[in-house]
């Protein structure tokens, strides 16, 4: 990201540490399937979700502490998805053992 965006992001929080925590939480939300608030043409053309989270915060469409998505709900969804993946792997292994 450009330095001007970093300065803007730092002005939105009380410290660079809080900014890093907020950015990391938003990146985890995106990884868990949260929709991006950016229009398609403004989305980052990279898989780096931290960069995308920083861009979202820099646009002002998300504000620290108020409009970030429900973290607990997305964490629960992520845990459910992961458990389903593990169960599918176990079932596949059991099927191979039967053959």
Swiss-Prot record:
Keywords: DNA-directed RNA polymerase, Nucleotidyltransferase, Transcription, Transferase
GO cellular component: DNA-directed RNA polymerase complex
Catalytic activity: RNA(n) + a ribonucleoside 5'-triphosphate = RNA(n+1) + diphosphate
EC numbers: 2.7.7.6
Top EC group: transferase
Cited SUPFAM superfamilies: RPB6/omega subunit-like
Gene3D superfamilies for this protein: 3.90.940.10
GO molecular function: DNA binding; DNA-directed RNA polymerase activity
The keyword Coiled coil appears for this protein: no
Gene Ontology biological process terms from the UniProt entry: DNA-templated transcription
Domain of life: Bacteria
Function, in words: Promotes RNA polymerase assembly. Latches the N- and C-terminal regions of the beta' subunit thereby facilitating its interaction with the beta and alpha subunits.
Subunit structure: The RNAP catalytic core consists of 2 alpha, 1 beta, 1 beta' and 1 omega subunit. When a sigma factor is associated with the core the holoenzyme is formed, which can initiate transcription.
Entry's family note: Belongs to the RNA polymerase subunit omega family.
Name of the featured protein: DNA-directed RNA polymerase subunit omega
